[in-house]
Amino acid sequence: MSKEDAIEVEGVVTESLPNAMFRVDLDNGFNVLAHISGKIRRNYIKILPGDRVKVELSPYDLNKGRITYRLKKK
């Protein structure tokens, strides 16, 4: 999957699971299982339940995604 093919959506982390996996409720109403991207992991950015995040979804499997960005709190 190339980066251009990925679908990028925003959502809210609802649950933290083992092995750096998270359950994310997307703005369009879907619920996906997401893992942390390498850059977030390398820079020690903490993701907690309640955080707004950007998630990349593969067009082949819309139930799994990758968290690419944690949005700022207002």
Curated annotation (Swiss-Prot):
This is Translation initiation factor IF-1. Pfam families: eIF-1a (PF01176). It comes from Synechococcus sp. (strain JA-3-3Ab) (Cyanobacteria bacterium Yellowstone A-Prime). Disulfide bonds: none annotated. Keywords: Cytoplasm, Initiation factor, Protein biosynthesis, RNA-binding, rRNA-binding. One of its GO terms (molecular function) is ribosome binding. Residues 1-72 form the S1-like domain. The gene is infA. Component of the 30S ribosomal translation pre-initiation complex which assembles on the 30S ribosome in the order IF-2 and IF-3, IF-1 and N-formylmethionyl-tRNA(fMet); mRNA recruitment can occur at any time during PIC assembly. Its main location: cytoplasm. Signal peptide: none annotated.
